[in-house]
Design a protein with these regions (language model features):
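Surface-exposed, low-hydrophobicity beta-strand/loop segments enriched in small/polar/acidic residues
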Residues: 1-141
C-alpha cells in the first residue's frame, strides 16, 4: 500500500482530494496508485499515476460510483514496500506492481511509468522505500 509520508510544500499535510468515476468491473484498494483513462479511474500499473486511492471499492459492470482520491504532485512523498529485493538506489526509478499498491524494485520497462526512489529504508523484499511519482518513462537499453 502506498501512503502519504509528507508534502514538501510546507503548507499542508495532505494533498487535496477529488472524486473520480470508477471503471466497470475494477477492484480498487486503499493506497493504490490511480491513473485517469477516458475520464475514469484505472489502476496505474504501468501508466503515470496522478492520484492515490483512499478507499476499498469493487465496481460492478455498470457502476456509477465515484472513488475519493488524493491528487498527487511532484512534492508528495509516498511510503511503500518492495515486492522483491532490489539493487536500485536513491534517485532510481522502480516499476510498480499490477495492483498498483507496491513498488517492485525492478527498473522501468520501455515506455512504462513508475516511482522515483527518494530514500530506501532497506533493499530486501518487504523493506520500505520513500518515493514520488515520476515523469520519467523507461527506455530501452
Amino acid at each position: 500500500m502506498f501512503t502519504i509520508e509528507k508534502v514538501l510544500n510546507g503548507r499542508i499535510n495532505h494533498p487535496e482530494t477529488e472524486f473520480i468515476p470508477v471503471t466497470a468491473s475494477t477492484t480498487y484498494k486503499k493506497g493504490a496508485l490511480i491513473a485517469i483513462t477516458s475520464g475514469k479511474a484505472v489502476l496505474a500499473g504501468s501508466k503515470k499515476a496522478t492520484h492515490l486511492c483512499t478507499e476499498d471499492y469493487t465496481a460492478g459492470a455498470s457502476d456509477t460510483h465515484h472513488i475519493q482520491c488524493f491528487i498527487l504532485s511532484d512534492d508528495v512523498i509516498l511510503r511503500t514496500t518492495l515486492t522483491a529485493d532490489t539493487s536500485l538506489v536513491k534517485g532510481g526509478m522502480s516499476a510498480i506492481n499490477t495492483t498498483a499498491d507496491e513498488a517492485t524494485g525492478a527498473a522501468l520497462a520501455t515506455g512504462k511509468y513508475g516511482v522515483e526512489i527518494v530514500d530506501l529504508i532497506g533493499t530486501k523484499a518487504g523493506s520500505e522505500i520513500l518515493c514520488k511519482i515520476s515523469d520519467a518513462v523507461g527506455a530501452s537499453a
